[in-house]
Amino acid sequence: MGRSISVSFGLLVVFLSLSGTGADQDCLPGWSFYEGGCYYVFDVKTWEDAEKFCQKQSNGKHLATIEWLGKANFVADLVTLNSDPRLDWIGLRVEDKRQQCSSHWTDGSAVSYENVVHNTKCFGLDQKTGYRTWVALRCELAYHFICSRVPR
């Protein structure tokens, strides 16, 4: 009984911290506040369309960036509360169009030829890893995505 109450209370605290603080920090309705930013999980788009959507909807902001462990945990909790198991885009992408993989092979030689089946220059979060590690995904596929913006 005591453990059940403790778990229920813990889930309530997480839910309130993700959903209730948005209004307190001048986030738009439904957006969640964390460390000076507002975050929202949207329905599926390709990586490029998701980034354009975030820029348009979020006054020039972008897909969510994850610069430290605390934010990674916040984003993972936000995605977990807002979805069934799935993949979600974040704002990470390989910008060098010529380079699919690492710039060097394990023997130290430079990558001058690639034979990769799919374009995996975009990154997202995977439910299989608890949404806490980044996975390379095909940019042209549509997944849910997390936008970030500054409070109003």
Swiss-Prot record:
One of its GO terms (cellular component) is extracellular region. Its main location: secreted. Residues 34-148 form the C-type lectin domain. The keyword Signal applies. Residues 1-23 form the signal peptide. Expressed by the venom gland. Keywords: Cell adhesion impairing toxin, Disulfide bond, Secreted, Signal, Toxin. Disulfide bonds join 27-38, 54-147, 122-139. PROSITE patterns: C_TYPE_LECTIN_2. It is found in: Secreted. GO terms for molecular function: toxin activity. Belongs to the snaclec family. Inhibits human breast cancer cells (MDA-MB231) migration and proliferation, as well as their adhesion to fibrinogen and fibronectin. This inhibition may be due to the binding to receptors of the integrin family, probably alpha-v/beta-3 (ITGAV/ITGB3) (40% inhibition of cell adhesion) and alpha-5/beta-1 (ITGA5/ITGB1) (by comparison with lebectin). Heterodimer with the beta subunit (AC W5XCJ6); disulfide-linked. This is Snaclec lebecin subunit alpha. It comes from Macrovipera lebetinus.
